Amino acid sequence: MTDTDRQAIYLKYYQEPAYRTSETFLKFDLTDGVTEVTARLRVERSATADADAPLRLEGDDLELISVVVNGTLLSGNQFQRDERSLTLFELPETADITVVTRIYPEQNTALEGLYRSGSMYCTQCEAEGFRRITYYQDRPDVLSRFTTTLVADGDRYPVMLANGNLLTDETLADGRRSVTWHDPFPKPSYLFALV
């Protein structure tokens, strides 16, 4: 998104989100050239939202691999996708949504979302950069607890950090390293960080 694409957002047009994402589980499979991001979201419909309210997830420059709602893989006619969003319809009051995307951090010259700087992967999510990582309610009034797993070559990437407290740090059967962080404090997506 360029500066000319950005539009002013006015308080007088504010609408409460139809859904809240209470828990966010992210897995980053970091390899040279491409990163696969699996985002599992626990969402609840807001008490003031209509029963048929859609869930709109923002996303920029993402390659969508799959969408699963409560264990059911959705086909292309069960959601709507455009350049900047993924919209899900007819959701129950609560849902577990899993979205798998591919991103290309080495090609990310916008320096928003996940990008590569020298030999490190970094994130810049403020103000709307998280939508360049995965489809998400990338707005400051949706607060979620984040659990983040990073999987990469531990020799090449000895520093693997994300928000919160370290839960696990292990070597996988293929020799790669898997590190999981959990942040117990709800926060908006623009405060997400990974290095």
Task: Give residue spans per PLM region.
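Acidic/His-enriched low-complexity segments
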Residues: 1-195
